[in-house]
Amino acid sequence: MGKVIGIDLGTTNSCVAVMEGGEPVVIPNSEGSRTTPSVVAFTKNNERLVGQVAKRQAITNPERTIISIKRDMGTDKRVKIDDKSYTPQEISAMILQKIKADAEAYLGEKVTQAVITVPAYFSDSQRQATKDAGRIAGLEVLRIINEPTAAALAYGLDKESDQKILVFDLGGGTFDVSILEIGDGVFEVLATSGNNRLGGDDFDQRIIDYLIDLFKKEHGIDLSTDKMAMQRLKEAAEKAKIELSGVTTTNINLPFITADANGPKHLDVTLTRAKFEELTADLVEKTMEPTRRALEDSGLTPDKIDKILLVGGSTRIPAVQEAVRKFFGKEPFKGINPDECVAIGAAIQAGVLTGEVKDLLLLDVTPLSLGIETLGGVFTKLIERNTTIPTKKSQIFSTAADGQTAVTVRVFQGERAMAADNKLLGEFTLDGIPPAPKGVPQIEVTFDIDANGIVHVSAKDLGTGKEQHITITASTNLSEAEIEKAINEAKKYEEEDRKRKESAETRNNADSMVFQAEKTLKDLGDKLSSEDKAKIEAEIEKVREALKGTDTQAIKKATEDLQQAFYSVSAKIYQQGQAAGANPGAQTTGGEQGNVYDAEYKVVDDDK
């Protein structure tokens, strides 16, 4: 079995780790960074960029740059670029392809399997979408695990004593809180809660809205209609937020942000930490409600929590740390890297699956209740939230009308009393039920949640033994045909990326060869015959001409021809030098040492 990597597929940044020698190691990307921006872009000539290079060009190419795609996972949203539309799964797969390629370069071997993390509060459709993204990227996703649980694995791998820990995970786009009991290699999740629409992006947006408002009041211009200005504001807001974690005042200076009839306009604003905290106070408070709910579900009080782990870049915000400190009456633990611990935990889980990590048992839970719609639109729960997974539960239902021969099973996920207020995961029909008075037929509905948190449902007529099975595939998930098409598209992009890389390397080699040849011509000077010099210069010119085009093979051929000509001349000079050194006539001519060398050079010239 090859290496199985652990991936934290984040809203803002992603990270990958692997087990090496029994220890989890973060894999740096091709740019040398330990995290990769979760950004995808398409240039005007449709070249695909992923990661740091995509983020760098976002200001000049905002309409073709895709950020925070994780927030759209499990939805039917599409990203339209020119005449092609991409699903969130396909965009996520592009990020995963980059991560996969970087891991392969680091490990020196093909990588085909991974453990990928998701927010604990992700629904079934969001989890399935993540699995599909992995498949499109050429990865078999062995396990989907919850981000807070992964962070707990990273923290507790070497801990001996029993502890109750709370993981407070505030990332770029999502918020989770999980409470676990750990000890003797067992990691048991007691409760989890969260908010899939709360994260660092929302804190950035408050600064952006504030700057737009100030600028409008001062200049009467609405920057929100200018996409390039908005991208500059987004980057400046993120930078200001990060800076305010370390200082109490920062300056946001964006010259030439826009222009009107009177000329260019500049934005120059001083933002204090106090003002930032005022703008985002309600966002910080929003993290407290899921925290209270998780504590309530676990049956614990704040004083019973031994450690609070801060996970996700947004937990560096001082107001967030202060809110946690105030709520629990103790300092949160800061001994783990909030950007890397989730990927490290995923790598540990990968190690468990491959047998590299022994004596570790992970017991996770389902974040939301699961059930079906029953008479009157009521949501009847079969599996309560925070039930340990994998799990299986059955319940007997019956028909609602006399002579009813079919029942439609509509599967929902959520906590509301009425089915319509929860998320519909999918539906299927069990037909062929023998006609009978209402309430007589016995229909057994079984819910089965696997270790990935993905739901399988079956309905069985106990009278006839007829059964229907489905793995939930909501309308937002991709069909098998769509996945296959996306896999082929991804392979095509991979091939294009390979060709682009080959082209760049070929051009670099050609440039390098031309430089080397020209330098050697200059260094050799008169030692080179005019015939050989002309030959090399002609080959250099052929390479230059080839470089003007885009034919990689032509550039390769011209470079190889120059290389051969260069080697041929070099060998000739070397042989002539040896022959001249061995000529005894040079020793018996007499005269001074200088004359001997003159004679040698003349001999070389004569031979040519």
Swiss-Prot record:
<dbReference type="InterPro" id="IPR013126">
    <property type="entry name" value="Hsp_70_fam"/>
</dbReference>
<keyword id="KW-0143">Chaperone</keyword>
<dbReference type="InterPro" id="IPR029047">
    <property type="entry name" value="HSP70_peptide-bd_sf"/>
</dbReference>
<dbReference type="GO" id="GO:0140662">
    <property type="term" value="F:ATP-dependent protein folding chaperone"/>
</dbReference>
<keyword id="KW-0547">Nucleotide-binding</keyword>
<feature type="compositionally biased region" description="Low complexity">
    <location>
        <begin position="577"/>
        <end position="590"/>
    </location>
</feature>
<dbReference type="Pfam" id="PF00012">
    <property type="entry name" value="HSP70"/>
</dbReference>
<comment type="similarity">
    <text>Belongs to the heat shock protein 70 family.</text>
</comment>
<dbReference type="InterPro" id="IPR043129">
    <property type="entry name" value="ATPase_NBD"/>
</dbReference>
<keyword id="KW-0346">Stress response</keyword>
<feature type="region of interest" description="Disordered">
    <location>
        <begin position="577"/>
        <end position="608"/>
    </location>
</feature>
<dbReference type="InterPro" id="IPR012725">
    <property type="entry name" value="Chaperone_DnaK"/>
</dbReference>
<dbReference type="InterPro" id="IPR018181">
    <property type="entry name" value="Heat_shock_70_CS"/>
</dbReference>
<dbReference type="InterPro" id="IPR029048">
    <property type="entry name" value="HSP70_C_sf"/>
</dbReference>
<comment type="function">
    <text>Acts as a chaperone.</text>
</comment>
<feature type="modified residue" description="Phosphothreonine; by autocatalysis">
    <location>
        <position position="174"/>
    </location>
</feature>
<keyword id="KW-0597">Phosphoprotein</keyword>
<protein>
    <recommendedName>
        <fullName>Chaperone protein DnaK</fullName>
    </recommendedName>
</protein>
<dbReference type="GO" id="GO:0005524">
    <property type="term" value="F:ATP binding"/>
</dbReference>
<dbReference type="GO" id="GO:0051082">
    <property type="term" value="F:unfolded protein binding"/>
</dbReference>
<keyword id="KW-0067">ATP-binding</keyword>
<feature type="compositionally biased region" description="Basic and acidic residues">
    <location>
        <begin position="493"/>
        <end position="505"/>
    </location>
</feature>
<feature type="compositionally biased region" description="Basic and acidic residues">
    <location>
        <begin position="599"/>
        <end position="608"/>
    </location>
</feature>
<feature type="region of interest" description="Disordered">
    <location>
        <begin position="493"/>
        <end position="514"/>
    </location>
</feature>
